[in-house]
Regions:
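General secondary-structure edge motif
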Residues: 8-9, 41, 82, 111, ...
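N-terminal leader/targeting and accessory segments in enzymes
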Residues: 1-48, 52-67, 76-78, 135
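ATP-dependent carboxylate-amine ligase catalytic core
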Residues: 22, 29-30, 34-37, 63-153
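Conserved small/polar residues in nucleotide/adenosyl-binding loops
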Residues: 154-160
Length: 161
């Protein structure tokens, strides 16, 4: 898929996907090679200000010579804003490549009975794949999925802080 097709694919999911179970997300992570396993995470949770805290942490970590990756929501202008490397939105090319990787995995899993991941879950999986490729010093993950997986995120991403 092209970048434009990737974005359309993700927005189309938003209309019909049910929230996946933790088992579904874990299965998809396994099929993707457990991209999160060797990364260090800071998990940012709370009612308000998560995106601001992530931006602040990115700046502080950069000032101290650390590389970062961040996954936040929502985006304001372009969906790429949700995944950042060293404070910069990922490129259209990187977005497209991650979407294609996750889409291929998801389509095979759905054929085996796994629920189609939601838009947010797809973005989460894409972010982890990009983080695995980049291997930043610290990954910043904002709580999402309506807070429903706050504890699960902690389990899935094994936060450093």
């Amino acid at each position: 898929m092209t970048y434009e097709e990737s974005v359309k694919y993700l927005y189309k999911i938003a209309g019909f996907a049910k929230k996946s179970s933790l088992e579904d997300i874990n299965y998809l992570l396994e099929q993707l090679g457990n991209p999160h396993k060797d990364l260090k995470f800071v998990h940012v949770a709370g009612t308000n200000g998560k995106g601001s805290v992530c931006a602040f942490l990115e700046a502080v970590l950069k000032e101290h010579g650390k590389t970062t990756a961040a996954f936040t929501s929502p985006h304001l202008v372009k969906v790429n804003e949700r995944i950042r490397l060293n404070g910069q939105d990922i490129s259209d090319e990187r977005f497209k490549d991650a979407c294609n990787r996750v889409k291929e995995c998801v389509e095979a899993a759905v054929e085996k009975g796994v629920n189609q991941p939601s838009f947010f879950e797809m973005m989460f999986l894409m972010a982890l794949c990009i983080m695995e490729e980049e291997q930043p010093d610290i990954c910043l993950i904002e709580t999402g999925m309506g807070g429903r997986y706050a504890v699960s995120y902690t389990h899935l991403t094994l936060p450093t802080i």
